[in-house]
Amino acid sequence: MSESFKVCFCCSRSFKEKTRQPPVSIKRLFEAYSRNGKMSFDELLRFVSEVQGERHAGLDYVQDIFHSVKHHNVFHHHGLVHLNAFYRYLFSDTNSPLPMSGQVHHDMKAPLSHYFVYTGHNSYLTGNQVNSRSSVEPIVQALRKGVKVIELDLWPNPSGNAAEVRHGRTLTSHEDLQKCLTAIKDNAFHVSDYPVIITLEDHLPPKLQAQVAKMLTKTYRGMLFRRVSESFKHFPSPEELKGKILISTKPPKEYLESKTVHTTRTPTVKETSWNRVANKILEEYKDMESEAVGYRDLIAIHAANCKDPSKDCLSDDPEKPIRVSMDEQWLDTMVRTRGTDLVRFTQRNLVRIYPKGTRVDSSNYDPHVGWTHGAQMVAFNMQGHGKQLWIMQGMFRGNGGCGYVKKPRILLDEHTLFDPCKRFPIKTTLKVKIYTGEGWDLDFHHTHFDQYSPPDFFVKIGIAGVPRDTVSYRTETAVDQWFPIWGNDEFLFQLSVPELALLWFKVQDYDNDTQNDFAGQTCLPLPELKSGVRAVRLHDRTGKAYKNTRLLVSFALDPPYTFR
């Protein structure tokens, strides 16, 4: 069978179409666990245990594999598996490199500060930060992808009689606040029952804060989590907060109170003048306090900004854990000057990182800087694209994709603080071999990659993690093949902090004259990675999984490493 490509109006080129044939290495693997070209239940169970590392698998597990490939009609009449059925099993969703989606397997009973949380930035924007449209659509999409922290910017409307959602001081449009709140309510627990946190960037006067409090109370009712005390040593756990929505923002009056000079020395004329003004405003504020008290009482996680260099935003009140926000530039400053202090602070308190203001194109930054210092809420523009977003999506494929990933022990040890800048010894080596891939012929038009020939695929593969572990490689190019076979090289990744490592793949079609064409990507959290030969499903630029396109890859850690 051949495949034809038009070269000009009257000519065409034909290529012999290659079928889905198992690579030689897979054939040898099958032969090692079969007899006379057929594999029995017991032999398949031995393969699953010895090669795939499924030590606790039994005959029920093997029967599920049989059923998963039964429709391929490649069984021996006695129920034995032929090579092609074995090959289809290896490429099936049953053979994923990660635990099944929806299977939460981390301890969810620790304080909220012990988890990385899937976090969005300016969650209502559909595009750039300057003049794009505001809508509930990106909020819905984010929640349905597992995002658990939604940000809303609240401003008075032009009439000053209601709050609206918009990116202030830009040309972006506004969205109705009630629509946003309802969208969150309707989609908050689509992926998992673990809590959703709404971070409010509040630019409202007390009267509108009171109005927002009524909207929140009416919309969420019993779903709304309320603090039972102003003093507590730790945040509640995700398990305790199941089905709850938490509000996080700066409490009213905090700004003015922070401006009042508290000192025992004789104040200057300038300070005295400011104190009089501030105290007068505070008195006026007290008159309106009855209006805003409901708003203040709804704030489950008190927030503070980290913008003033003279203010110690990492001071830890043992009775009042808080959330501190800082942009990526301020994070870099903190990392250089107070890295271990930041790690200590995040053991009890929450830290939210957000993109710097110059990222007007809604691009993103390296999330690992925040994660390696314990920051729980590394906020991303979910409407953006690119490698950094793929890494973010990869991190939260962990723990069943529930939106919460337990931080590794190294970030929670109160006695030996983790220092990401320190050079650690190699703990283990990840060995990866990419055998083959398939599905592009089903997910793409036959001229998508090249008008005149089948595609020339190659794979880039690398580690995202601490600087010492960050490295990448690429395979050779498989020329003119819809079903490329590589498998000659084994890629070795020496890992000093495997707990924070993610493995990324990017497939491209090689083009000699123009930019290489994108052909799929994915990112896998190393602590979740299963050993053995696995089917790695690829995703498009936005993170949506292709229906058919996969790589067949083997993974092994040498020596084996225990993550949790």
Swiss-Prot record:
Alphabetical list of CDD domains matching this protein: C2_PLC_like
Residues that bind Ca(2+) 2: D450, D509, D511, D517
Catalysed reaction(s) here are: a 1,2-diacyl-sn-glycero-3-phospho-(1D-myo-inositol-4,5-bisphosphate) + H2O = 1D-myo-inositol 1,4,5-trisphosphate + a 1,2-diacyl-sn-glycerol + H(+)
Single Gene Ontology BP annotation: lipid catabolic process
Top EC class of this enzyme: hydrolase
Ranges where the EF-hand domain occurs = 19-54
Identify a single GO molecular function assigned to this protein: metal ion binding
List the InterPro entries hit by this protein, alphabetically. C2_dom, C2_domain_sf, EF-hand-dom_pair, PI-PLC_fam, PLC-like_Pdiesterase_TIM-brl, PLipase_C_PInositol-sp_X_dom, PLipase_C_Pinositol-sp_Y
Principal subcellular localisation of the protein: membrane
What is known about the tissue distribution of this protein? Expressed in leaves, roots and siliques, but not in flowers.
Question: GO terms for CC?
Answer: plasma membrane
Q: Where does it localize?
A: Cell membrane
Q: What is its EC number?
A: 3.1.4.11
- Stretches assigned to the PI-PLC X-box domain: 106-250
Top-level lineage group: Eukaryota
Q: Which Gene3D superfamilies does the entry mention?
A: C2 domain, EF-hand, Phosphatidylinositol (PI) phosphodiesterase
Question: Which stretches are transmembrane?
Answer: none
Cofactors per UniProt? Ca(2+)
Give every C2 domain span. 406-539
Protein task = The production of the second messenger molecules diacylglycerol (DAG) and inositol 1,4,5-trisphosphate (IP3) is mediated by activated phosphatidylinositol-specific phospholipase C enzymes.
The entry's protein name is Phosphoinositide phospholipase C 3
Q: State which gene encodes it.
A: PLC3
